[in-house]
Amino acid sequence: MRIADYSVTKSILDRYGFTFKKSFGQNFLTDTNILQKIVDTAEIDKSVNVIEIGPGIGALTEFLAERAAEVMAFEIDERLVPILADTLRDFDNVQVVNQDILKADLQTQLKQFSNPDLPIKVVANLPYYITTPILMHLIESKIPFQEFVVMMQREVADRISAEPNTKAYGSLSIAVQYYMTAKIAFVVPRTVFVPAPNVDSAILKMTRRDQPLIEVQDEDFFFRVSRVGFVHRRKTLWNNLVSHFGKAEDTKARLEQGLALAGIKPSIRGEALSIQDFGRLADALKQVGF
């Protein structure tokens, strides 16, 4: 029997009198086949360490611990710590850290692995309400995570992996794909969770690029320009740029100059621009004094 078997999950929750906290976005997976697929998708073996976020009662952790060198699981809900100590008692390669991943000093924390030089993969069932902040925090942390295999709301997975000229494409697609490749591995129905969420989930596999997808003069400015391009999706790029940078004649003249330098039509919409287009635009705008 596995922790994720429905009868086992229910028995654990009943034994500890555990009640779900909506503020933590808690939905526990009760399908062992899906858990096996997650670990297979992540290609976990004894040559990698794993960071897990939100282990819950340890359903995914159990599968990870069987395959990985070590697992470090970050759990924000202190009520789950004694439950995890119980459900994972047979594993000596799991550390549970009772901390918000967004506040953790990851550089220091990762030194707690027995062999901190092993590649690190992130495997997690992320809370829907905080998926994007967690992902961007980890991606921008400068820690060389090799890969992310994470469950999230289907809509967010679609946005992250989207291509230009699609409804889902936006600044989040650009922010992630600049650093990583992103592909939906499979979809997870809402019916396999306790309690069942209101939407379906997807497993997104993201692999870090050796180098960012493009080279830009100023990364922060590049991300800023890409966000500006999507502020009002139905507006033209020109209207979004003017709304953001200002309507002064000198400003508009420099915007025109930057667009011309980048070879981009002012009448285009942000969703039609590739990451490379946004990179050229950001560099051109820097060149004309922004």
Swiss-Prot record:
GO terms for cellular component: cytosol. It is found in: Cytoplasm. The keyword Cell wall biogenesis/degradation does not apply. Keywords: Cytoplasm, Methyltransferase, RNA-binding, rRNA processing, S-adenosyl-L-methionine, Transferase. One of its GO terms (molecular function) is 16S rRNA (adenine(1518)-N(6)/adenine(1519)-N(6))-dimethyltransferase activity. Its main location: cytoplasm. Gene3D superfamilies: Ribosomal RNA adenine dimethylase-like, domain 2, Vaccinia Virus protein VP39. S-adenosyl-L-methionine binds at residues 27, 29, 54, 75, 100, 125. It catalyses: adenosine(1518)/adenosine(1519) in 16S rRNA + 4 S-adenosyl-L-methionine = N(6)-dimethyladenosine(1518)/N(6)-dimethyladenosine(1519) in 16S rRNA + 4 S-adenosyl-L-homocysteine + 4 H(+). Its EC number is 2.1.1.182. It comes from the Bacteria. Coiled coil: none annotated. Transmembrane segments: none annotated. InterPro entries: KsgA/Erm, rRNA_Ade_diMease-like_C, rRNA_Ade_Mease_Trfase_CS, rRNA_Ade_methylase_Trfase_N, rRNA_adenine_dimethylase, SAM-dependent_MTases_sf. The keyword Metal-binding does not apply. Signal peptide: none annotated. Belongs to the class I-like SAM-binding methyltransferase superfamily. rRNA adenine N(6)-methyltransferase family. RsmA subfamily. PANTHER family: DIMETHYLADENOSINE TRANSFERASE, DIMETHYLADENOSINE TRANSFERASE-RELATED. Specifically dimethylates two adjacent adenosines (A1518 and A1519) in the loop of a conserved hairpin near the 3'-end of 16S rRNA in the 30S particle. May play a critical role in biogenesis of 30S subunits. NCBIfam families: ksgA (TIGR00755). This is Ribosomal RNA small subunit methyltransferase A. It comes from Streptococcus equi subsp. equi (strain 4047). The gene is rsmA.
